[in-house]
Amino acid sequence: MNRTIKHIFIHCTGGNQLAMPIDLMKEFAQKGWKKPGYHIVIDFMGRAHLMLPFEKVANGVKGWNLNAIHIAWIGGEDGKDSRTQEQADTMKVIVKLLKEKYPEAKLMGHRDIWGEDPKKWQKTCPNFNVREEF
């Protein structure tokens, strides 16, 4: 499938920071999803794991997935930005590479679909301000 990428979404998984990609795949299967919620996840050591090729549609943000790529750091169960330095560093490299490949794509945190007012957010994912960070 040839997709036009309009958005790059940054997420946290909202779970235990020590989880591994296989744990996430089990969670997605339990939800009845045929595909993962993210294209890439970053574990606590800063290792990036490809969960789904970019050519395929992930289940990251309902209603926004067709033209989006989803990147997540594993963790965030406390609702805070508890990324390790390794996760933050890897995220910066991935975002830089994706922005080079898809220069027209808008970079957003999951929560940004509800605007800038925290009172309107249905979740705090990715638990930090993507616009300020990147």
Question: Over which residues does each language-model region extend?
Answer:
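Basic/polar, cationic surfaces and motifs that engage anionic cell-wall
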Residues: 1-9, 13, 45-48, 67, ...
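A short, structured beta-strand/loop element
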Residues: 56-59, 63-66
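Ligand-binding face of N-terminal immunoglobulin V-set domains in extracellular IgSF glycoproteins
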Residues: 71
